[in-house]
Amino acid sequence: MRKKFIYMTVSLILLAFLLLAPVQAAAASSEGLLLWFHTLLPMLLPFFILSRLLIALDGVSGITRFLAPLARSFFGLSPNGSFCLLTGFLCGYPVGAKISADLVRENRITPEEGAYLLTFTNNPSPAFLTGYCLTEALELPERVPVSLLLVYGAPLLYAALTRHRQTFPDLSIEKKTSGSQISFKIVDACIMDGLENILKLGGYLILFSMLAKLLLLLIGSLPLCSCLIVGLLEITNGIALTAASPILTKRAAWALSLFIVSFGGLSGAAQTESMLQGTQLSVLNYLKAKAGTALLTACFAILYLGLTDLPLALPLLAVLLR
């Protein structure tokens, strides 16, 4: 009932926005659509199709041959789980969630391993972090190495802290795909699955772009609140606002942007939930893990700033913990 009430309220708010401010609403919708068409569609659709095909044809083991032993030693993952680890760190939101859910549906990993993977493998892509966030928006390309270390080190540390010494079974030994099962029906099914999921992402991106624009119209006179609220809602707009904020220095904007990109936004959480349908994986546990990871990232970023500028780090820490 609570979820239904939230969805109904948001729907009514967006409908009112469309009716009362059609120009601004249409502009926000257009921005979301263009971001989907120019970025998500060409980047994620081929990966959705090919990763689904690899799972269906049991081709994961060849890709993770060298990573699997390390992933098992440090995180207790199965070989199929190490594939999710690899793709979730390389390919961006919400690929980690989709691969986890696909592997659970195909009985390639246990639901327990899927839930564990979901807590740390759904991350921003290196291309988004280094290209858009650090180079285009913040204009801090010199911070690329330390940013990569913080943003990807935090979820790995979170995973290590929450593992509880558990080792997950390798279900790929029990389930193999024979050559007689390989046909164009499998390819067709993978293509349709990819198209369905990429269309869902487009819809969510449009809706959350409209919400972000509405929030900007309502609280635009409060720059720091705008950065935090919009960033927690949708990371692309949040990072753009943070980078352009007149009250934040470059260093403070960098730390806040890492917090935003590590959390992934409620838009990313909604996209993640859409990927989890048909499984028992919980989006609430995912949100708790992302909040913990974002706080770890922010603390490490502030610590890094504190090593060179303590007077700046202390007020920034107070703002983030308020």
Task: Give the role of each language-model region.
Residues 1-9:
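N-terminal membrane topogenic signal
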Residues 2-3, 105, 135-138, 142-178, ...:
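Juxtamembrane and boundary regions of transmembrane helices in multi-pass small-molecule transporters
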Residues 9-24, 29-41, 45-49, 53, ...:
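Selected transmembrane alpha-helices and immediately adjacent juxtamembrane segments
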Residues 19-30, 56-60, 131-132, 211-222, ...:
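Transmembrane helix-loop junctions in multi-pass membrane proteins
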Residues 39-48, 52-61, 89, 93-97, ...:
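Transmembrane alpha-helical segments of multi-pass membrane transport proteins and ion-pumping complexes
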Residues 69-81, 170-186, 230-236:
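Juxtamembrane inter-helical linkers in multi-pass membrane proteins
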Residues 74-138, 229-247, 252-279, 288:
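Alpha-helical membrane segments and immediately flanking helix-loop junctions
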Residues 187, 191-261:
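Transmembrane helical segments that form the transport core of multi-pass membrane transport proteins
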